[in-house]
Amino acid sequence: MSQNKLAALIILDGFAIRDEVKGNAVKQANTPNFDRFWNQYAHNQLEASGKAVGLPDGQMGNSEVGHLNIGAGRIVYQSLTRVNVSIDEGDFYEVDAFIKSVEHAKKHDKALHLFGLLSDGGVHSHINHLFALLRLAKKHELENVFVHAFLDGRDVGPKTASKYIKETQDVMDELGVGQFATISGRYYSMDRDKRWDRVKKCYDAMVYGEGPSYKSAQEVVDDNYANEIYDEFVIPSVITDDNDEPVATIKDEDSIIFYNFRPDRAIQISRTFANEDFRDFERGDKAPKKLDFVMLTNFSETVDGYVAYQPVNLDNTVGEVLAQNNLNQLRIAETEKYPHVTFFMSGGREKEFPGEKRILIDSPKVATYDLKPEMSVYEVTDALLKELDKGEQNAIILNFANPDMVGHSGKLQPTIDAIEAVDECLGKVIDKITELGGHAIITADHGNSDEVMTLEDKPMTAHTTNPVPVIVTKDDIELRDGGILADLSPTLLDLLNVEKPKEMTGNSLIKK
């Protein structure tokens, strides 16, 4: 195979197709380059949610799920689906890591702390998994069970915390097990960009009982709302008892079960509790030691602890197939989506394949990306164009983060600005690839920026279930209907004249 063979997979993160113009940044943005490629080349749309990506029917897709399905070239049944089935069939209550955790707490008269994202968004966690853990604690007759709730407001509506707090309180009251101990917005507890000052605020509330104090979880929300601070950004707060003491703090040898299933935003805070050698901030003299730490799924090799649900092994992902065929590949993205084009695209593998190069461009250090809608798209593009000029790569996997990351703000104009910046860069990248005799697949992993405001003009910060576009920049071809994300890697391999492996049950979108 000639070394000048070139094909690219370009993922416009959070960019989907929706007819309604109102609240739709994709429709309202000026996108001359995307429109040019859509009109010039074969195009269609792909399902990127629900059963098409291994999620429950009607469940919106997300970046982790999307990149896993894309890279695997097959439908990958997601952790949400696996755990739901496990609860329904009763296996959940027999999982070794859970049993050891509750038995450890019971035997040593220690507390069991349950923490995770408190919503039914289904992107990072699901509240039903917390309820199942509370039932497990009840079954084992545990008394000291505490919930450290991370409020969402991003994968669900921005002001929905009260609903989830009430649902959780009702379950705890019904079972006679569990109390809220701390409440934090996910902005603090689930940072993934090394903003350790945020994580420390959450840690200090959970370990030292430091932070604003309230008598109930609902009071935390009410007070923050009064100051126009909504779910995602709620300041880490401590629930106190009748003596104004914290209901619970995390102490030596306590048990912790972290019920998020998606790794990327769970890693940093996990390391603060699980890793004895943690050094990213000073944890203080009373940092709890010898904790029994359980992750719902395998968050990372960098987190010490037990894993409840081990990953499903994915062989022959697109990166592995490219390496087997002695083709060079480049993975490039800015920080926010770097794990997606590397770890998730490779089926949960951290290490590069032979011939794989990775370029990480730092995302801008701003509080929220609506303040800088272009993010680092120009820097990503410049780095890629330089790499293309070298002529060393055969396959490019590129992610433009902006439509998703700015779309999460629920602010229409910044999201339009984000998409227009991406469109400018998309034009440069495709023109360069075409000049070099290569082809590209332009697509997305899920919806978001296609619905930033509701029809009632309220911010819509969650993903959507809308189909995503696919364009293949090759003349004289047609694309078939009925495509899903799992068909993208077989299509990329097709452009490179590489046979797809039997493990890839997806099929090339190019009509034969």
Curated annotation (Swiss-Prot):
- Which molecular-function annotations from GO does this UniProt entry contain? manganese ion binding; phosphoglycerate mutase activity
Q: Which UniProt keywords apply?
A: Glycolysis, Isomerase, Manganese, Metal-binding, Phosphoprotein, Sporulation
Q: Does the keyword Metal-binding apply?
A: yes
- What is any Pfam family matched here? iPGM_N
**Job of this protein:** Essential for rapid growth and for sporulation. Catalyzes the interconversion of 2-phosphoglycerate and 3-phosphoglycerate.
Question: Could you say which protein family the record assigns here?
Answer: Belongs to the BPG-independent phosphoglycerate mutase family.
Protein's recorded name: 2,3-bisphosphoglycerate-independent phosphoglycerate mutase
Annotated organism of origin: Oceanobacillus iheyensis (strain DSM 14371 / CIP 107618 / JCM 11309 / KCTC 3954 / HTE831)
- What gene codes for this chain? gpmI
